[in-house]
Amino acid sequence: MTDNLGFQADREAQPADSVQTYPKPAGGAPDFPALELEVLDYWARDDTFRASIARRDGAEEYVFYDGPPFANGLPHYGHLLTGYVKDIVPRYRTMRGNKVERRFGWDTHGLPAELEVERQLGITDKSQIDDMGIAAFNDACRESVLRYTDEWRAYVTRQARWVDFDHDYKTLDLPYMESVIWAFKQLWDKGLAYEGYRVLPYCWRDETPLSNHELRMDDDVYPSRQDPALTVGFKVVGGELDGAHLLIWTTTPWTLPSNLAVAVHPEVTYVQVRSGDRRFVLAQPRLAAYARELGPEPEILGSYRGAELLGTRYLPPFPYFMDNPNAFRVLAGEFVTTEDGTGIVHLAPAYGEDDMAVADAAGIAPVTPVDSNGRFDAAVPDYQGLNVFDANPQIIWDLKNGSGAAAANAPVLLRHETYEHPYPHCWRCRNPLIYRAVSSWFVAVTRFRDRMVELNQQITWYPEHVKDGQFGKWLAGARDWSISRNRYWGTPIPVWKSDDPAYPRIDVYGSLDELERDFGVRPDNLHRPYIDELTRPNPDDPSGRSTMRRIPDVLDVWFDSGSMPYAQVHYPFENRDWFETHYPGDFIVEYIGQTRGWFYTLHVLATALFDRPAFKTCVAHGIVLGSDGQKMSKSLRNYPDVSEVFDRDGSDAMRWFLMASPILRGGNLIVTEQGIRDGVRQVLLPFWNAYSFLALYAPKIGTWRTDSPQVLDRYILAKLAELRDDLTREMDACDISRACEQLRQFTEALTNWYVRRSRSRFWSEDADAIDTLHTVLEVTARLAAPLLPSVTELVWRGLTGGRSVHLTDWPRSGELPADPGLVAAMDQVREVCSAASSLRKAKKLRVRLPLPKLTVAVENPQHLAPFVDLIADELNVKSVELTDAIDTYGTFELTVNARVAGPRLGKDVQAAIKAVKAGEGVVNADGTLTAGPAVLRPEEYSSRLVAADPEFTAALPNGAGLVVLDGTVTPELEAEGWAKDRIRELQELRKSTGLDVSDRISVVMSVPAGRAEWARTHRDLIAGEILATRFEFGEPADPVAIGDGVRVSISKV
């Protein structure tokens, strides 16, 4: 009968007057997924999560912000990764004494939701939404974003993440939205929100502009794309260059009908060249690039500085806007380069930021013949109705053949080629974007950009380089943020305008109270179309005919999520005191792309509204990649079902795989089944087996104590004390991957050294060993609890019978005895044994074959002297010699790190390399290296210990010394090795026949004649190791064949 945590016996069921024993795990390999489900069931019945928070009532709060995911699909590994970190840090902080509320959030607005509904309803055009009605469409959006909430809850719970779903926040909730419009009103009142006409990235499929930061979140926003690249000549009229053609280069032929000017760099040299019966003007540095068309040495008719060309007039390639004042002349542009193209840039002010800026300065009004769907309108009749990208071939045809409107001004198509380049695409619908001048509302980020840079210095980033790298550089170049979207499902921009320009007025609202005051009704839904229905007479119109109407735009969804810290608690309308004493938050985590997304918008709004950072510590992890090496994405569906991984390997295994990887240091990670299973092999299974070993061999429950005099006990306790300090340091710094590595190394020392070397003590029921392992496992379970919450719960409850390891405190500093000298010495012993074992394996000298001698050459051999017998026993050698004569067995090979040293040393680095190669480098006492004329710092060179005889010599890690194995095998050693092989086989036979480890046995052995002498010589050794009180040579009854022709029978005495 199993109890609720998979054990065969429940401690509470044991009679009070009986000897209390550990609950014993079920036999066979542990089924971690099944055990985890039992833990989850126990937590649910026990309400352990709420208890963990309640026990910290009154304690200092640690504020964690849960970045809201879009819930319009099921979670993938990227969500799991972030979720694990969101679980680990709060668990750790709770154990350290903080109260950590964990409130789940849902990001519900914006294009992701709208596009999903459009897909479900077969909508392909915004006009279809208007036809069905905004109310019906938004109702469908509301239903869609909440459709998967139950599945999300199941997945998050299955990953053993503790988070409060019952008090979650949703960005669509009225209180949340009220806080968002409050934030907008605050920006307006501060003069930091304004309406402007700018060139912005624009999605013609979704008919809305995007903000610049949305184009920089992920690399896949800029996939490679092939576009036509044209070199076109515009004919000059008047002046010295009359009749010549100004050569421009463009990868957007569709913008040529909107050409209003060209730009040159004032300081670049331009030339007029003759080619056949035509003359062309281009930048002199670009002549060679056009040798095919212009000839290798074209006749140069004149040379001009760019400044001399300013004001030159020309005919545009298409005549649609010939009456535009001040247009069709050469302007100055500092952005013009000669790295590609012709050095002359065609300007279509409505479709380029630089174009707009230069044209504005020249008094040229932009023209916008492309409508909101990305199609040419009636102003360009030849291409009317065509999408701009579909129009490209027709435009090229007309330019090439002088047909259509291109015939009017005689442009010359000099070159038509295909150009492959990264091109921005909509991050949701995946269509190529265009740049288009639109009216939009902006946050004036440039007004407080420098302050954002300053406040960033108060944030602790992990990895650290993000602060002044990816995030800091982005802040330094931040531009005003376009926050309006011409869409439906989102928080409304709370701006009402007069519908009569003769009586202009703008009203901005920041609360339900303000809306009720002016409109006489208190909204119970701030979404469209209901908010749009609030109108009132314009107070500034004495005629009483004009009306105040809300502008139709909604806010960028990133404004919603960036408002999360205050909007989730309905600040400032509720919880004012709490928010103002708990802001900024202590910790957030998301993937690195959020430096342009959530991290950025949090920082923008926090700086503008509160002049403070939004968060104190931020983990920006790398990207989990799918099987195709691309970022995992719901839309690409390039990842296996998460539930399959949980069912096969378990959540702790997945957690370990992700948390121990380089992804938390900013690297990327491809999920593999083998990687997940390695987590089971490296940590989960060894830790579980250590508990199982204790439960199996301990006659009663151990006592928590740390006073054993035995050296191995003292070592593992001191090693554990170091682990406690290491994990505390790493977890305080949110360096979770480093914490995992520290735990892995300790688990290796615990199971593959301490337990293995102490087995005989457990078999003999040594109280020191049992109590020490009990203590070590109890403390380790607490230390590992945030990282492996399920398996540690099982082990800790098995050890203690307590309610939950997650209701305990983090081990205190000084709780365990420290002994750094012993730890250093024993760790070096382990390194010696590991290196020598590798030599054995390489030479195919089996472990049970004794060898004559091991020589250990280290700097301070006296530190290893107390452990000579241990080394000899571990390695099965007859003697161990310690020496400090390292140079007898190897030499240190020095290498100059030219890449590091070069910038500082200049040409002296080559002299240093030459001196080192000649053996003239000298390592100084302070760690520097004198080589020729240079003194190199420790990071500017490396030192590697190289064995003189690599066949039987191996170096210790970090150049600490060498081990030399004597591989001579004598007949006597071969005989002893033969006996030890039989001992192993007999031990296996004991186990397979069901004998207890302490049972004494009788043995009858038949040995081939050629091995009889070996068997007689080592009879006592064999008998002693297998607990045989009677041992005879002869013909056994019912014999069992073991190795090398030996047959035996055994029986319990």
From Swiss-Prot:
Residue numbers covered by motif 'KMSKS' region: 631-635
Annotated binding of ATP, by residue: 634
Cofactors named for this entry: Zn(2+)
Subcellular compartments: Cytoplasm
HAMAP family given in the database record: Ile_tRNA_synth_type2 (MF_02003)
Subunit structure: Monomer.
Protein name from the UniProt record: Isoleucine--tRNA ligase
Organism name: Mycolicibacterium paratuberculosis (strain ATCC BAA-968 / K-10) (Mycobacterium paratuberculosis)
